[in-house]
A protein has these predicted regions:
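Active-site-proximal, substrate-binding regions of enzyme catalytic domains
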Residues: 2-89, 97-100, 106-108, 131, ...
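Generic anion/oxyanion-binding catalytic loop in active/binding sites
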Residues: 12, 118, 137
Length: 160
């Protein structure tokens, strides 16, 4: 199993469908920087009640170097990329397209919310994908219906 750094978008997507626990089931350990914590705790995040937020506190890990990437990506994403390098993580869990492309250009292996859910499905940790995808669509998460339906068809589930 591997270590992962998690960005806000992935935590929001998993929290929305009550699947934060998948992080502990798929990865040896996971962490996120203080900027991600600030984003989660300071803004309205459906799916994140106090209990879920409190359970995540033990995964906060501050960065120790200057955040030189905040000029080219959001603060939480930039701290996540920096933390990835500082603790020599195996994966960066991130959804934002631009930030993901920058991270990949730095040689970082990225997985998004969809990838985590698909890993969980393959391991038998998730029975059905369609209820998860429906919630994401209803909540305006940044996934296209076309792509989600292609995934559902691949796993022999009805499109949404």
């Amino acid at each position: 199993m591997a270590k992962a750094i998690v960005d806000t978008g992935v935590l929001k997507s998993l929290g929305l469908v009550n699947k934060i626990d998948l992080l502990e089931l798929i990865f040896e350990d996971y962490f996120f920087p203080e900027a991600v914590w600030h984003e989660l705790s300071s803004y309205d995040n459906p799916g994140f009640n106090k209990r879920i937020l409190n359970s995540l506190k033990s995964h906060i890990f501050p960065i120790s170097t200057k955040n030189h990437l905040s000029l080219i990506m959001d603060y939480g994403e930039s701290e996540a990329v920096i933390l990835f390098g500082e603790i020599k993580a195996d994966f960066l869990l991130i959804d934002d397209f631009k930030a993901r492309k920058i991270a990949e250009s730095l040689g970082i292996t990225c997985i998004g919310s969809k990838g985590i859910i698909l890993k969980a499905k393959e391991k038998g940790l998730v029975e059905e994908l369609s209820p998860i995808f429906k919630l994401w669509m209803e909540s305006n998460r940044f996934f296209t219906k076309k792509l989600l339906n292609q995934i559902l068809v691949k796993f022999e589930e009805n499109p949404i």
